[in-house]
């Protein structure tokens, strides 16, 4: 929708540039403006090159442009800016197109793998993990919405020391009958405590790691049974949050199929590896890193970083775009890995680094045994959501209230996490996240439910004339609906899911302003009533597509 308007503006602008004898790429030269539907600042970019005042440059381009056509009503010269405005035909087309399904899917193509969550199989997810999961899953949904063929992937760290500690714990301690990931965590924490009290036992964990890497059949069964058991519990939490992975890749795959050996040989051929105390290391001092990257321990076992390089090589060979979501504590190692990949001529991943999310009560740690799990957080938010739904809809039965509370709780958690730019730390506060009146997920969900209610009360919608929608609230809402594909396109390109969260809030705001000031069911004459019903249906579809892309349920009644 909006991209069609932008494409026509680009054509008009390019015609003006060509007539002026100017060849300049139009990327990032057009943007939304409070004073117009689109505005270009291209004159500022050309001014120093042409050694002319930006106003004069803009005037030359403006005077050389062709006439507006299908989607562009007019262009205006305002100082150094050229502003563009949507035509009535375009606005009518938005409302008409938004009645169907095709409007909400992009035209991109190509394969993308997005690796996210990838928590160690040693316990349940905590709030820090789920910021990774929510950001990652929302990126997956945005890329799919843009048209890409996307695979969501979980990388299982089955060869790490934490997993070996779990295996040792399962050999020496009993698993309780709680949710699998929680049961594994209790064994892990108890094993960690024993190791602290009896450090000599750590040699047994080292031996487990060595035997697993050498593919000892008995040990392989133990490791994979423990890891799969933990992941089965983690999956239940993720599914509760509408998060699903398409595939799981295990670290061990890349050791056993020779990929890690191949990476080590490639790195040694660079002439940049050194042996230090028996360990093979990659010297990255020329690239500005003080510490070398350890590739293989003195005992011959590989490290997470080496296996990760093999995994990245596999991804680069099998997908056109490679995206991974990592916590801020991975910044250094991620930079080192990307440097190593560059040295080998392997395509680098697009990395989304997120800062941490916390609760008002403090941080969480699996090793110390003091953490607030994602399950506990979701249970508490759902309990509070149930109280709010009961207060608002006491006449509804228990099943309805429980169902809505579950959808509202997950929406509240997901939205509150994703609304903040990934590079900013945030604190989750359920009171703010569950506020139905403020700009939160429940506010957006309620806007969708309100649109559904209006449509249900109206019954069958006859044909309508979108040209009757002419007041400020109607036009503002139509323009916001049109922006959906632009927001998806930019968020997919820049991997910034918070942009879609912002759009969802603005769309709900525009819809509620329209609803407040423009009667729908009581509108007269009937032609205007039908036109506004058409706009309500377009709004419902836009809200539904937006919430779906955010991984948030869109209840028809709240």
Swiss-Prot record:
Q: Per the UniProt entry, what species is this protein from, by scientific name?
A: Methanothrix thermoacetophila (strain DSM 6194 / JCM 14653 / NBRC 101360 / PT)
List the record's Gene Ontology CC terms alphabetically. cytoplasm
Give residue numbers for sequence motif 'HIGH' region. Answer: 119-129
Keywords from the named record: Aminoacyl-tRNA synthetase, ATP-binding, Cytoplasm, Ligase, Nucleotide-binding, Protein biosynthesis
Is the keyword Ligase in the record? yes
What family is it from?
Belongs to the class-I aminoacyl-tRNA synthetase family.
Any one Gene Ontology BP term:
arginyl-tRNA aminoacylation
CDD domains in alphabetical order: ArgRS_core
Principal location: cytoplasm
Which Pfam families does the UniProt entry name for this protein? Answer: Arg_tRNA_synt_N, DALR_1, tRNA-synt_1d
InterPro entries associated with the record: Arg-tRNA-ligase, Arg-tRNA-synth_N, Arg-tRNA-synth_N_sf, ArgRS_core, DALR_anticod-bd, Rossmann-like_a/b/a_fold, tRNAsynth_Ia_anticodon-bd
What this protein is called in its record is Arginine--tRNA ligase
State its location(s).
Answer: Cytoplasm
Q: Which reaction does it catalyse?
A: tRNA(Arg) + L-arginine + ATP = L-arginyl-tRNA(Arg) + AMP + diphosphate
Q: Which SMART domains match?
A: Arg_tRNA_synt_N, DALR_1
Keyword Nucleotide-binding belongs to the record? yes
* E.C. designation(s): 6.1.1.19
The Gene Ontology terms for molecular function here are:
arginine-tRNA ligase activity; ATP binding
